[in-house]
């Protein structure tokens, strides 16, 4: 899987769902008088729910076919099945990054979908991937205190179209060693402009595709 090691893996889950708690930031208060009433700071807290899904894959191999073959096909079949498993993991992770999170803020309430805030969505603007868009994404992580200065790892998914956009942008391929390496190898994977770039050819969309940038935690 391209993405599995780049998120927090909860491992084996018992049951049809699991939850994760989230909490907003809190700040210190000034003490202006002695023996005054305690001022409580109530952070924004919530619970997010992840629903489990089932998938399977079965490929038949007739016993008569095995006898007719010099080589055992099961090794190749197994490798293709394992590759399908990894692709499905990536598809599920990508859909979760794009989709709404099920969240509630009190015990008696019900879970409802919470989409990514509009302020964290960079519009296509009729252009492909540009240096300006990458810098804007980088700025968002810094604004949200969710970059390497806070111990985070940042990733961005790219496909062949984005590869073409980046390699064709002279403002990105005319300066440093990484730019030279990009042009020599025709590849943009690795870390640059603050992101670790992850190849993924299943970005959704037709004329306009949607990629995602995220922090591991």
Regions found by a protein language model. Give the residues of each.
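Sequence/fold signature of self-assembling virion shell proteins
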Residues: 1-4, 11-29, 43-51, 55, ...
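Short, Lys/Arg-rich flexible segments
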Residues: 1-7, 90, 147
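A general structural signal for short secondary-structure junctions and capping/turn motifs
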Residues: 9-12, 143-149, 187
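Structured, hydrophobic secondary-structure cores that serve as assembly/anchoring elements
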Residues: 19, 25, 39, 46-75, ...
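Short Gly/aromatic-enriched secondary-structure transition segments
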Residues: 33-40
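Alpha-helical scaffold segments that mediate packing/assembly in large oligomeric complexes
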Residues: 64-143
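Short, catalytically relevant binding-site loops at active-site mouths
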Residues: 99, 161-165, 203-205
């Amino acid at each position: 899987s391209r993405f599995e090691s780049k998120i927090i893996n909860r491992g084996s889950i018992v049951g049809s769902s699991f939850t994760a708690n989230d909490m907003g930031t809190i700040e210190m208060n000034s003490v202006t008088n002695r023996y005054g009433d305690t001022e409580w700071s109530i952070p924004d807290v919530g619970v997010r729910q992840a629903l489990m899904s089932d998938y399977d894959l079965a490929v038949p191999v007739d016993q008569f076919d095995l006898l007719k073959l010099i080589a055992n096909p099961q090794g190749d079949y197994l490798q293709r099945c394992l590759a399908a498993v990894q692709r499905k993991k990536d598809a599920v992770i990508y859909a979760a990054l794009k989709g709404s999170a099920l969240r509630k803020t009190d015990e008696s309430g019900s879970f409802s979908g919470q989409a990514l805030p509009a302020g964290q969505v960079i519009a296509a603007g009729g252009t492909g991937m540009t240096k300006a868009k990458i810098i804007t994404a980088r700025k968002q992580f810094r604004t949200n205190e969710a970059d390497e200065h806070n111990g985070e790892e940042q990733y961005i998914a790219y496909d062949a179209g984005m590869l073409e956009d980046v390699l064709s942008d002279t403002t990105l391929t005319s300066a440093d060693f990484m730019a030279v390496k990009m042009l020599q190898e025709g590849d943009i994977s690795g870390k640059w402009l603050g992101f670790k770039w992850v190849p993924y050819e299943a970005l959704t969309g037709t004329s306009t595709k949607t990629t995602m940038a995220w922090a591991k935690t």
